Amino acid sequence: MRYTPIIGSQDDDVEYQSIKPKHYPCPQCGKRGKRKHVITRRIAHVAALNRRSWIVADVGVYKARCACCKYFQAAIPDVPPRGRYSLEVRNTVANALIRDRMPYLSVIRRMQEDYRLALSLGYIHACFLWAHEQINMETHWDFVRTNFSTLHRI
């Protein structure tokens, strides 16, 4: 079990969510499963500067009625499946890497100072790869062909 710092001190920003309907569709096939129990998930989030931010969600665990899986959890909005960080954290890291052109270790230091998040080097690299996958290469090459043709105009 991972160590989790105490959540709920006065300097923390906590957003509570409840995602636990009686029935929820399977993520693979869409067949509805029945809720068996409820767990609490704590996901690190980026909200305000110099404050730790969390999403604390009560999430339903469902028994599948299909052959895709035995059990599954309800999806939390803006959090990847089995994710420890929200998509906003991933987006903030990707912006620091690409738009601000910061090196990996500077991004780690910045996230620690600004948002009190201790991120690993592997997670920073995964955010960079995720941002690279978001690029639509067909539209990129169309842009390059129209704006940077091989003919030089004088």
Question: What kind of region is each of these model predictions?
Answer:
Residues 1-80:
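Short, flexible loop/hinge motifs at secondary-structure junctions
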Residues 48-151:
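Short, positively charged, Gly/Tyr-enriched micro-motifs
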Residues 154:
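Extended mixed-charge, aromatic/glycine-enriched low-complexity segments
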